[in-house]
């Protein structure tokens, strides 16, 4: 059976990357929430 996690940097960046987050209002909310919490890494 194939494992479910087949890593790809490109797919990761496109769905969870900083620019992907900034592209939508909800994504910007996510970034701002992580900034407010003091996260070292805002996105993948």
UniProtKB/Swiss-Prot annotation:
Gene transcribed to yield this protein: rpmH
Q: According to its record, what are the GO cellular component terms?
A: ribonucleoprotein complex; ribosome
User: Domain of life, per the record?
Assistant: Bacteria
By sequence similarity, the record places it as follows: Belongs to the bacterial ribosomal protein bL34 family.
Record bears the keyword Ribonucleoprotein: yes
Listed transmembrane segments: none
Extent of Basic residues compositional bias: 10-19, 34-44
Checking InterPro entries in the record gives: Ribosomal_bL34, Ribosomal_bL34_CS
Q: Does the keyword Ribosomal protein apply?
A: yes
Annotated organism of origin = Aliivibrio salmonicida (strain LFI1238) (Vibrio salmonicida (strain LFI1238))
Keyword terms of this UniProt record: Ribonucleoprotein, Ribosomal protein
The name on file for this protein is Large ribosomal subunit protein bL34
Q: Name a single GO biological process.
A: translation
Region ranges (Disordered)? 1-44
Q: Which GO terms describe its molecular function?
A: structural constituent of ribosome
């Amino acid at each position: 059976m194939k494992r479910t996690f087949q890593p790809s940097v490109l797919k990761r960046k496109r769905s969870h990357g900083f620019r992907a987050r900034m592209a939508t209002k909800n994504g910007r909310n996510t970034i701002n929430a992580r900034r407010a919490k003091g996260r070292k890494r805002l996105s993948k």
